[in-house]
């Protein structure tokens, strides 16, 4: 029975282009997971979009003398294009400035407020001393009063996991200009997190399948749970849906509150765009559906504590949650099943920093290198379990010594020889025990790699796939069919047949990781259709007449299945080309020189 799998991907912020460190944390792992489950025949809904509200966007707009909407429009397109070119197979990649998102966000706010889970409190708001604008909590840094970490943020300390307010920090400073923020009394709305403390503690304690860092960080956060501000004094954001704020532009819903709601609103938008307006309920109110959230480690508690609290408070109510007389009447929205958090990627030993030039944007990278080469590196050497460093030397080494030399070499030597000598899948003779052993080992990879992917252990899964490819290379080197063909044509045909079957199975195994090259290989092997076909952009017209673009794809047409090879004898091959490009080591110095020029 196919499962309903929600793949909820962190929303990239639309105040600039995204760099490779961003997609290492949320994009590539989520896409690998989604593609695997589609191949398994499960019903996948992968959603996200650009996060377009808040002070950072207004700061860029002020600097350029334009509007926040213009900035959001620009970077929504740039980011969408980057994710398309990287092959991230969203069912819907949308944005938070749609009428649908506003409606869903306001419905959740209103419902939580009516149920007493949103309260009013007077607090000290942080404002920039130079611009007078509200400073988001994450734009304020200082020393943690509990552990002494000197880069604690205004909402939490990433070192000890404590929940903080900007006023808690010792020597707070603005990340915008380095100046101390100005604190002024102001009234805000707060999500009453302590009201959910017991439920959250019991629920998190039951999540034995979570990564230890996610579970421990979340439990630690619960120790000092307090109400969380969900509004800010600014003009750019989702309006507060209460009568007294109908004509006020000085206070809006805080960007973090509406961003996490985006997972739900994007699912609802997908259903509307597909002509099945209630289809989203199959993922959100189906007790058998499973939700997987992908993000960097700095967003853990938003997905393990704050968003679950909002879901618990909303339950089955509100305009969207209610399904009177329907299949899901009275069934609450589902909580996360797993929160897959990645660590941080650094670059040449330093933190990514756009302002300091320590960065390479996705579009810049893909203008010179293949998407699958980047996807390979970010998976095999990425920050899955610990902070890792991207260096150009390591990227070139991994590409040449692993991707090209192992998997690329196996495909090239097999297909080029078979195409030259047979033109189609050859008729094998009797299989020897050695033939059967290598076939069985690769066939077993469907299960072993699949289990690792299902557990979100992407690095181990890719390493196992590469190990299997290496085993087939060893088999060919030992059997030497290019020599055997001179004296025993049938035996050579058998060896190449076995190699083709292994390559065909490995093609499926590599597809979630390397979709572009896997699709080309699929075609070289004589197949038609898509196992990892093209994505597409669609223009969507909202009820208010506005249009926006969504990244999506017709994934139901994909023909791949997570199964061993069924490559038929006699299938005509297409002329193959090498799957990957070997990189000249001179690119290392060229790229380091580019980075140095950005540093000035």
Curated annotation (Swiss-Prot):
Protein name: Methionine--tRNA ligase
Motif ('HIGH' region): 12-22
Gene Ontology terms: cellular component: cytosol
Cofactor field: Zn(2+)
Database matches in NCBIfam families: metG (TIGR00398)
Annotated Gene3D superfamilies: HUPs, Isoleucyl-tRNA Synthetase, Domain 1, Methionyl-tRNA synthetase, Zn-domain
Motif stretch ('KMSKS' region): 351-355
Documented EC number(s): 6.1.1.10
Function of the molecule: Is required not only for elongation of protein synthesis but also for the initiation of all mRNA translation through initiator tRNA(fMet) aminoacylation.
Location of the protein in the cell: Cytoplasm
Subunit details: Monomer.
GO MF annotations, alphabetized: ATP binding; metal ion binding; methionine-tRNA ligase activity
Cofactor details (free text): Binds 1 zinc ion per subunit.
Signal peptide start-end: none
Coiled-coil residue windows: none
Annotated residues for binding of ATP: 354
Originating species: Chloroflexus aggregans (strain MD-66 / DSM 9485)
PANTHER family assigned to the protein according to its UniProt record, in alphabetical order: METHIONINE--TRNA LIGASE (PTHR45765), METHIONINE--TRNA LIGASE, CYTOPLASMIC (PTHR45765:SF1)
Keywords from the UniProt entry: Aminoacyl-tRNA synthetase, ATP-binding, Cytoplasm, Ligase, Metal-binding, Nucleotide-binding, Protein biosynthesis, Zinc
InterPro entries: Anticodon_Met, Met-tRNA_ligase_1, Met-tRNA_synth, Methionyl/Leucyl_tRNA_Synth, MetRS_core, MetRS_Zn, Rossmann-like_a/b/a_fold, tRNAsynth_Ia_anticodon-bd
GO BP, sorted A to Z: methionyl-tRNA aminoacylation
Residues the record lists as binding Zn(2+): 144, 147, 157, 160
HAMAP family assigned to the protein according to its UniProt record, in alphabetical order: Met_tRNA_synth_type1
Reactions performed catalytically: tRNA(Met) + L-methionine + ATP = L-methionyl-tRNA(Met) + AMP + diphosphate
Source species, domain of life: Bacteria
Record-stated family: Belongs to the class-I aminoacyl-tRNA synthetase family. MetG type 1 subfamily.
